[in-house]
């Protein structure tokens, strides 16, 4: 039975993981930053060492292609993920899916195994969406869900323009995104949750990726003295925000989804002043589209009620709306069979996080393979994956 060189893969994950660690000890490689350029350069160098042909498209997606005269006209099989990170990140998220694909090709070449199809390893631009929105941008553009022109014009949180930054770091490619449609796409990823580690599973065959709705909410109240304004005479934006947070938790406990108030700020943000303004984000997720849509409707209805009861003014702005994505059943079954043939404990999974695979599922049969996240930790320097 063919096996990859696990030590080599882990060593390369460690090397890539060193890139982007600042003086504060935090690992951060935001999309199209200098640190991410260094990470891109490392991955490209490893692809070239393995004898792969490098293609970079207009949105900066990197592809390492292994083909031959015999199979280059056949529709390729693609694997991949991303190498950009969140702030203060772990070293496995995304990177495992890129470097493991490269390791598979190296192993096949070293053992003299020829494949029916070309194999492509992809590293997609801006999966995390920290510096530029939306997340999963590179794969979304590749799959035709967002125009490349619009994506390249995206203004980042630091005022930079994505297209300018890709050009600056040397990754403004020459090939149109979507230059090839794969026969199938597989993304290997850490679970980013606690289930597999807690239940002792080695492999997750991911058959669904839950839908995601993000929105910004702005609340206008009235600033007033914290000590002299009676409770029943306050128009408190901070209190309204807190009520929305509690409502979201109670809502998803009924629907089986999850909801998160991930960012929040108050104005004037003073210890002795009732907040006149509150700005925050809401992240709602559910693997069932009907339940996801209903949760958003329930929240919007509640906001109207809150305006009346608390005398505040509330406005909303959609950020991201991705429907749940069912993955290819045949691929999921093959993942299960392969795991069992190696005596690995496998279970079906739903991905709670957005991934590049959900975008690639728009254009080809797609599935994901999960490995456990030890203690469920991810987006954290303590992130560890295991088999």
Language-model regions: role of each:
Residues 3-89, 108:
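Acidic/His- and Gly-rich active-site-bordering loop/insert found
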Residues 6-22, 80-81, 345-386:
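Zn-dependent metallopeptidase/amidohydrolase metal-coordination segment
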Residues 29-31, 262-269, 281-288, 313-332, ...:
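A short beta-alpha structural unit
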Residues 57, 114-118, 173-178, 228, ...:
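Flexible, glycine/charged-enriched surface loops at secondary-structure junctions
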Residues 60-62, 83-85, 119-130, 192, ...:
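Acidic, glycine-rich active-site loops and adjacent beta-strand->loop/helix elements
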Residues 75-88, 220-226, 342, 375-378:
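Glycine/charged-rich beta-loop-alpha catalytic/anionic-binding loops adjacent to active sites
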Residues 85-158:
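A generic, well-ordered mixed alpha/beta core segment in the N-terminal half of proteins
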Residues 126-127, 131-290:
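Midchain, well-structured core segments that form catalytic/ion-binding scaffolds
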């Amino acid at each position: 039975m063919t096996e990859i060189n696990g030590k080599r893969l882990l060593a390369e994950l460690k090397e890539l993981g060193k890139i982007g660690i600042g003086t504060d000890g935090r690992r951060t490689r935001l999309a199209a930053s200098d640190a991410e350029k260094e990470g891109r350069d490392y991955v490209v160098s490893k692809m070239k060492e393995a004898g792969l042909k490098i293609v970079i498209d207009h949105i900066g997606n990197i592809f390492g292609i292994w083909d031959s005269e015999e199979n280059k006209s056949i529709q390729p099989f693609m694997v991949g993920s991303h190498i950009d990170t969140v702030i203060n990140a772990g070293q496995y998220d995304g990177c495992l899916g890129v470097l493991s694909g490269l390791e598979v090709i190296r192993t096949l070449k070293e053992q003299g195994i020829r494949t029916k199809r070309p194999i492509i390893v992809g590293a997609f631009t801006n999966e995390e969406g920290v510096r530029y929105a939306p997340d999963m941008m590179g794969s979304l553009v590749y799959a035709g869900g967002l125009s490349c022109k619009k994506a390249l014009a995206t203004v980042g949180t630091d005022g930079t323009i994505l297209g300018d930054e890709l050009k600056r770091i040397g990754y403004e490619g020459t090939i149109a995104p979507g230059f090839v449609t794969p026969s199938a796409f597989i993304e290997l990823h850490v679970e980013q949750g606690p289930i597999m580690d807690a239940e002792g599973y080695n492999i997750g065959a991911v058959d669904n990726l839950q839908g995601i709705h993000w929105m910004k909410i702005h609340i206008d109240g009235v600033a007033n003295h914290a000590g002299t304004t009676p409770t029943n005479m306050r128009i408190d934006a901070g209190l309204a925000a807190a009520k929305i947070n509690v409502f979201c938790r109670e809502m998803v406990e009924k629907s089986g989804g999850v909801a998160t108030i991930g960012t929040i700020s108050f104005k004037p943000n003073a210890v002795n002043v009732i907040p006149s303004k509150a700005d925050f984000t809401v992240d709602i997720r559910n693997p069932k589209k009907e339940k996801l849509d209903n949760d958003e409707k329930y929240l919007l209805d509640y906001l109207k009620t809150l305006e009346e009861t608390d005398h505040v003014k509330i406005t909303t702005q959609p950020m991201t709306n991705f429907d749940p994505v069912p993955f290819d059943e045949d691929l999921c079954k093959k993942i299960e069979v392969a795991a069992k043939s190696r005596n690995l404990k496998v279970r079906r999974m739903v991905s709670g996080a957005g991934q590049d695979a959900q975008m690639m599922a728009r254009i080809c049969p797609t599935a994901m393979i999960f490995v456990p996240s030890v203690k469920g930790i991810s987006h954290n320097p303590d992130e560890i994956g295991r088999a």
